[in-house]
Amino acid sequence: MRDFHLPGRSAVYGKNGMVATSNPLSSKVAIQILEAGGNAVDAAIAAAVLQGLLEPQMTGIGGDCFILLSPAGSEEIIALNGSGRAPAALNATDIRAAGHSIVPTGGVESITLPGAIDAFCKLSNDYGKLGLKSSLAPAIHYMKAGVPIAPRTAFDWSLAVDNLKGLARDFYLLKGKPPTAGQMFTAPMQAKVLEEIAQKGRDGFYKGEVAEDMVSSLNALGGVHSLDDFSNV
């Protein structure tokens, strides 16, 4: 219950687990995972992947992942760095030769290999209870069914329109315009990617058709990413 004697947020207490995300639907899904017998790892993966649909201007499965966790009944703290490296063929000499003194933040040179999916797979396998398929199921459902866009997300989205290039404009704009607050947004193609991962594990993302599509898109932008880079994440 809200403590009206104090300003700001009240302290929250719970016996079996807590969830905090920036979107109520992500929090709800994570709680449902816990109620279904999952643990914090299962719930965190479910919420994180769903966030890529609810707030794609902030996060997504093409990004990285950093985790601190403490296994139940242990005082040990485990850290996992789920960030990807730069492609093997990228070097500073070529970047300077192209006229850059720093890595251009808006260029293909700044795109590293996505490490989040590899981290999620390892986390689920090593520390989860329900399995990766269960953790990905909520995001797959909502990517097909759609979600209403929150006001703050719509505001951020409108500021990022000029950053969208090529096919990204088809996937992240609605009739050429950013979605407004309350509009439904779906990502059926991303749902297919998650289904591949649910079926094949990390190989569904870092090998085969999905990896080939990412490499092709990056190469078309001038990137030096390769299939070997992805398979070696």
Where are these predicted regions, by residue range?
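Noncatalytic scaffold domains of N-terminal-nucleophile
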Residues: 1-32, 40-207, 211-233
